[in-house]
UniProtKB/Swiss-Prot annotation:
Note: Heme 1 (or BH or b566) is high-potential and absorbs at about 566 nm, and heme 2 (or BL or b562) is low-potential and absorbs at about 562 nm.
Residues reported to bind heme b 1: 107, 209
Organism this protein belongs to: Rippkaea orientalis (strain PCC 8801 / RF-1)
Assembly mode: The 4 large subunits of the cytochrome b6-f complex are cytochrome b6, subunit IV (17 kDa polypeptide, PetD), cytochrome f and the Rieske protein, while the 4 small subunits are PetG, PetL, PetM and PetN. The complex functions as a dimer.
Protein name as it appears in the record: Cytochrome b6
Amino acid sequence: MFSKQVTDSPIYKWFDNRLEIQAISDDITSKYVPPHVNIFYCLGGITLVCFIIQFATGFAMTFYYKPTVTDAFASVQYIMNEVNFGWLIRSIHRWSASMMVLMMILHVFRVYLTGGFKKPRELTWMTGVILAVITVSFGVTGYSLPWDQVGYWAVKIVSGVPAAIPVVGDQMVELLRGGQSVGQATLTRFYSLHTFVFPWLIAVFMLMHFLMIRKQGISGPL
């Protein structure tokens, strides 16, 4: 992984003596890859790349976005029309969001069709299902943030769905909306979920997912 010139340098040796960099490097680069692996086994990694792009572009937009019902739409227009390369950053964010969902769906189908969910990888599959739910939740909450007509009515419909659940349905709707109707509290909740709660959740479950894949390796052919 590292050239001889790098490994012979005093700086590298100093770090290697303390962190065992060479052992970590050897473990990463010497992992066995089965011969049946093809491009479709890269779909999970592509999903991760899309998430990283989402995180970077989303973080950039938080400097200008205002999560209020009076300023949200105007702040999005400001990003698109006034901020340098703002239109590009938001466009990349939107397109990578669609790509992330698509790659996630294809990844789920690939794992299912190749039997990657079977013993001993049941927990890997379960964390993957949780990641899929979080990914879709990202899309639902992010869709509302521009607070335009499409976003507003999408929130109104989505947040009203739990009302069909017996006993606790109305309480769930009120919890999602922050009140009886869609308004500022709803936007605040969706913004908090989209920019804080879901990123932490997806990071934790991604780490678990990758550690289990690393431990168990890639599943064999059918």
